[in-house]
Amino acid sequence: MTEEKKENQKIVNLIIISDSVGDTAFNMVQAGAVQYPDVKFNYRRYPFITNREKLEKVFNEITEFENVLIAFTLIHEDEQLAAIKFAREHNMKYVDLLSGVIENIHSLTGEEPKHEIGAVHHMGQNYFDRISAMEFAVMYDDGKDPKGFLEADVVLLGVSRTSKTPLSLFLANKNLKVANLPLVPQTHIPDEIYKVDPKKIIGLTNDPSVLNEIRRQRMIAYGLNPDTTYSNMDSINAELDAANKLYKKLGCYVINVAHRSIEETAALIMEHLGIDDYAK
């Protein structure tokens, strides 16, 4: 933007008032503001304005502002009316983001609203739990940190190419905290694995021929010789045998992922855990 345009740039002060976190109001206002790339917007958020006294403090702070748009999500009618009255008296624009929706639903259903502060925020908690589960899955992928096994809702074990990582992420999307461990020949199994409730451990296996083809294709994709120890049938059989011995020792639930989609395997895991659909 040129200096001349900067000097002539219009400025709007966006005042966001909410009796909860204020994310709903902020997102809606921002969605409108981005339609005006040449306008400078100054955002001021006032969350948790839950009574008239707090609201009056906001009014005192913004009373001298110019070019103001007040956007509010206030459940109680007296605070709504106070915000509207203040805006009109000070020649400020305003938008009530909740009342219209609530009134129309009441008109259609005859039901009375419960006037619960922060109801949208509570509803969104499931979303934040899911994000937390996704972060957990990434943090404890491939056995990066053994302590994750003790904190997880599910622990996936399996040799290479048994869908551990995609399964972890799929289950995380169901709000499950998942850690996984690749079973590599001649490597130490972390002590934490033996401390996990066997019901939480899922042993993944595969058909040798399927695993052979998957690994060969993986090597080809990397531009490498497909005939290596990694894809050798004898090596694959030895890996699977070692994995099955570990599963038997742990007493864990075993799933053969051959010819199964991620969704199908995840459904079996959730059924085993007694979960219908964790992400509700």
From Swiss-Prot:
Enzyme class: transferase
Transferase as UniProt keyword: yes
Domain of life assignment: Bacteria
Kinase among keywords: yes
SUPFAM superfamilies noted in UniProt: P-loop containing nucleoside triphosphate hydrolases
GO molecular function, one term: ATP binding
Amino-acid positions noted as binding ADP in the UniProt annotation, renumbered to this chain: 158-165
InterPro entries in the cross-refs: Kinase-pyrophosphorylase (IPR005177), P-loop_NTPase (IPR027417), PPDK_reg (IPR026565)
Keywords for the protein's UniProt record, in alphabetical order: Kinase, Nucleotide-binding, Serine/threonine-protein kinase, Transferase
The protein's Enzyme Commission number: 2.7.11.32, 2.7.4.27
Catalytic activity entry: N(tele)-phospho-L-histidyl/L-threonyl-[pyruvate, phosphate dikinase] + ADP = N(tele)-phospho-L-histidyl/O-phospho-L-threonyl-[pyruvate, phosphate dikinase] + AMP + H(+); N(tele)-phospho-L-histidyl/O-phospho-L-threonyl-[pyruvate, phosphate dikinase] + phosphate + H(+) = N(tele)-phospho-L-histidyl/L-threonyl-[pyruvate, phosphate dikinase] + diphosphate
PANTHER family per the UniProt record, alphabetical: PYRUVATE, PHOSPHATE DIKINASE REGULATORY PROTEIN 1, CHLOROPLASTIC
Family listed: Belongs to the pyruvate, phosphate/water dikinase regulatory protein family. PDRP subfamily.
Biological role stated in the UniProt entry: Bifunctional serine/threonine kinase and phosphorylase involved in the regulation of the pyruvate, phosphate dikinase (PPDK) by catalyzing its phosphorylation/dephosphorylation.
Protein name: Putative pyruvate, phosphate dikinase regulatory protein
Organism name: Lactobacillus gasseri (strain ATCC 33323 / DSM 20243 / BCRC 14619 / CIP 102991 / JCM 1131 / KCTC 3163 / NCIMB 11718 / NCTC 13722 / AM63)
